[in-house]
Amino acid sequence: MTQLVFHHDINQLNNLPNGTIPVHLYGMGNKKLQIAHIGNMVLDSVKRLGIKLNNQVMDFLTIAMAVTAADTFVLRKDTANGWCRSFSITLPLCQPDIWQKNKVHLEQILHFLSGDIWQFDFHAGGQLPPQPYKLSGRTKLVDLRNKDCVCLFSGGLDSAIGVIDLLEQGNSPVLVSHSYKGDKSRQPLFSNLTKMVILTNFPNLMRLHNHI
């Protein structure tokens, strides 16, 4: 089982047992000390929402960061059967009691989605929600006015269909995307191709052009 220990304070990631993968949450890590990192720009993105997150939402984001890191850093090809990985994740949260009550359910969901074995050890001391940026000319905030839902958008046709369905139902979605190093440069191309396909085949959804 691969042990991963996460913390937003890099000083808490020293002197861990051999074989443990230390991961600096919302920071830059330390190459010299072999401390990995994830989400160093995430807190800035959260601040740009212009709203203060509650602790439960922040904890959910922290768990998502940990799951993404584990899935990224531990390769399937290095496992005994070339597929199933086993993770033991130690993670600080703002309100660990809430997630401790749902730990088994979370582990089962991730096992179903990934085919991997997940074990979580939640404890106190998690990253608190950052103070949002205030509206000013220097900082561009995400425009959440009149938005009533969130939709994942990769730039491909599958996620575009999800956007179309929401718009046809009268919703106004915020589109959320993610890219890894190497494919970010291709996303504008995929997004533009998606727009062309949608606007050609769904002329009644011209308003979609303003959402992508």
Language-model segments: residues:
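RNA-binding accessory domains that recognize and position tRNA/RNA substrates
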Residues: 1-149, 163-204, 209
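Catalytic nucleophile serine of serine hydrolases
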Residues: 153-154
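Hydrophobic/small residue at the entry helix of a nucleotide-binding pocket
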Residues: 157-159
